[in-house]
Every structure is written in structure tokens, then in C-alpha cells.
Regions:
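Active-site acidic-Proline motif in GNAT/NAT acetyltransferases
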Residues: 76-82, 106-107
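Conserved N-terminal entry element of GNAT/NAT acetyltransferase domains
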Residues: 1-11, 140-145
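Conserved GNAT acetyl-CoA-binding A-motif
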Residues: 95-107
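Acetyl-CoA-dependent GNAT
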Residues: 7-78, 89-91, 95
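Conserved acetyl-CoA-binding loop-helix of GNAT-fold acetyltransferases
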Residues: 81-94, 113, 117
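Short glycine/proline-centered loop/turn elements that form peptide/ligand docking sites
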Residues: 85, 89, 107-111, 128-134
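Short hydrophobic/aromatic beta-strand or adjacent loop that forms the aromatic wall/cage
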Residues: 46, 133-139
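Conserved acetyl-CoA-binding loop of GNAT-fold acetyltransferases
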Residues: 116-125
Length: 145
């Protein structure tokens, strides 16, 4: 196994959307916001890392330096539990060097447990409209290493 990482660009929007879609399907997260089962994830003003497992795109992380916040961290289901998510998280932590936050859907128990295992702590719970329904979210925060 050889994990590599590179900076992502807007040319990776479709790739990241495909990885995110695969992970959402795997976690049985509603995807009513999709049109024709296609997701293009715009980079906007975020920074992005793309992880490769033996030269195959395996995951990505979009994050904000100014907010010290992970906007998205998704791993292709074929590569979950192989260290890709940890690899992405560690690279973001080294880049930010400040406490990091992430918002996770409460129904995504697998992701919540993963972040808690990585020493994130519960910061906030709230509900807001998402996909046309009231949805519960958790904010998790981690001090840097």
C-alpha cells in the first residue's frame, strides 16, 4: 500500500463529487439534493487535498484555513478502513496547526465514532433544514497534535 497526497484544484470537483456520492450511498445518507445522481463539488474558496492509494483516487478533504474547519472529508468506500481518512486528517492538521472543527450529520454514526477515536470532542448540537427536512448536526473540535 502506498498512500500519496496532492493539492486539489477546481479540476477535481467532479472527482471529489464522485467520491462523496459513493460514501453517501455507502452510509445510506439521503441524497435528494442530487440531480441525475451526479454530484460536482465546487472547491470555492477552500483548500483541498486528494489522497491516492497506489495511484487510485481514494479520498479527499476540503478545508478552510481562515475558519480552521474541515468542510468535507470523504473516503471512497473501497478504501475505507485502510488509513486514507487518517492520512488526510493528519495532513490537514499539519497545515492548520490550530484547533480544527468539523460538522457531522448526527445520523452518520460511523463518522462521529471515527472523529471521536481521533480525539475530537463534542462542541455543539443543533438542527437546521437540510435536504428539505429538519436535520440534526454535531460540531466536533480537536486541538492540534
Amino acid at each position: 500500500m502506498k498512500l500519496k497526497i496532492r493539492e486539489g484544484t477546481i479540476s477535481d470537483d467532479e472527482l471529489c463529487g464522485a467520491i462523496m456520492l459513493g460514501a453517501l450511498v455507502s452510509a445510506d445518507i439521503p441524497r435528494s439534493f442530487l440531480k441525475d445522481d451526479v454530484l460536482i463539488l465546487p472547491l470555492r474558496s477552500n483548500l483541498r487535498f486528494i489522497a491516492f492509494y497506489d495511484q487510485t483516487p481514494a479520498g479527499f478533504c476540503d478545508y478552510s484555513v481562515s475558519k480552521s474547519h474541515i468542510n468535507y472529508l470523504f473516503v471512497d468506500p473501497l478504501f475505507q478502513a485502510s488509513g486514507v481518512g487518517t492520512f488526510l486528517l493528519e495532513n490537514v492538521q499539519r497545515r492548520l496547526e490550530t484547533p480544527i472543527s468539523v460538522n457531522v450529520l448526527c445520523r452518520n454514526e460511523k463518522a462521529i465514532l471515527w472523529y471521536l477515536k481521533k480525539d475530537f470532542t463534542f462542541t455543539k448540537l443543533w438542527s437546521e433544514q437540510f435536504n428539505g427536512q429538519l436535520t440534526a448536526w454535531l460540531k466536533l473540535t480537536k486541538k492540534t497534535f
